[in-house]
Regions:
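A domain-start/cap signature at the N-terminus of enzymes
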Residues: 19-54, 67, 77-80, 84, ...
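Gly/Ser-rich "nucleophile elbow"/oxyanion-hole loop immediately N-terminal to the catalytic nucleophile
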Residues: 44-50, 98-141, 151-154
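Acidic catalytic loop of the alpha/beta-hydrolase fold
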Residues: 190-194, 259
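Active-site glycine-rich loops that stabilize anionic/oxyanionic intermediates
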Residues: 52, 59-64, 258
Length: 259
């Protein structure tokens, strides 16, 4: 089972017995001289009297909002958990043939972290948002960008989820979280695009391993560095680093043979 299929299955299971949700609201905002697109969903339970959590869901590299909403439609979950759901659109990356990327390829220099910060402020100007419960999740490059937000927009991001991606190399050089930050990963052991054991090419490390990724966050989050494992299915193992006092959880769904 691929990690992308597992994500779809998890969303499907969570949404069982839930009536179909209402539609998305498509919108734009000007940022850094560009018209940026995003699509969001407000549950019917929102009436403006109670602050709602905010969840960002980021598509993968060269993805588009509409396709990702079809693959990862979280509206039924937003209805039951009562949060506002946002799907932003990545910008064109001139260093990568104008593909749609959250992070620029070398020698590109754009930075979308401030854009997400501005988008949070824009949405919060129109809706009552619980500023202590703003979350990010994403698939592949979207998962990598979720780590980026946990590292560089940590004052606004409470927790993240990353599917099919480990962290970039040497996180201590760029990651400066200011509070314990919950982290959930869904990683396939046979993923050749984002290898489970990290990626080193030509003697240069580009991505650290799943083990190193979880160790980084378990240490930062004051968790026990030894995980507890239980079997979810013959192909999925669940690891949790959450037993120490004051720990902000770290959790992995490890897909055996997943790519």
């Amino acid at each position: 089972m691929t990690t992308k299929r597992l994500l779809s299955l998890l969303i499907f299971i969570t949404s069982l017995s839930v009536s179909y949700a209402q539609g998305y609201i498509n919108s734009t905002m000007m940022y850094d001289g560009l018209t940026r697109e995003y699509s969001f969903y407000v549950p019917a339970s929102y009436d403006g009297t109670t602050s709602f959590p905010l969840l960002f869901n980021f598509h993968g590299g060269n993805g588009v909002i509409a396709d990702w909403q079809t693959t990862a439609d979280m509206r039924p979950i937003a209805d039951t958990a009562n949060f506002i759901l946002v799907y932003p659109q990545a910008r064109q990356d001139p260093s990568d043939g104008n593909s749609l990327n959250w992070l620029p390829k070398t020698p590109g220099t754009f930075d979308d972290v401030p854009f997400i910060s501005a988008l949070i402020d824009t949405i919060a100007s129109d809706y009552q948002i619980d500023q202590n419960r703003i979350y990010a999740c994403g698939y592949s490059l979207g998962g990598e960008f979720s780590y980026e937000l946990a590292c560089k927009l940590n004052s606004k991001i409470a927790a993240i989820g990353a599917v099919a991606r480990t962290m970039q190399a040497d996180p201590n050089s760029y990651c400066s979280p200011v509070h314990p930050t919950g982290v959930l990963t869904i990683l396939g052991t046979d993923d050749f695009i984002s290898p489970y054991n990290g990626l080193t090419f030509g003697g240069i490390e580009y991505y650290i391993s799943a083990e190193a990724t979880h160790s980084y966050w378990a240490t930062h989050n004051n968790c026990d560095t030894t995980a507890t494992m239980n079997t979810v299915s013959p192909s999925v193992e669940r690891y949790t680093w959450s037993t120490a006092s004051g720990c902000a959880y770290v959790e992995e769904l490890k897909v055996i043979g997943g790519g």
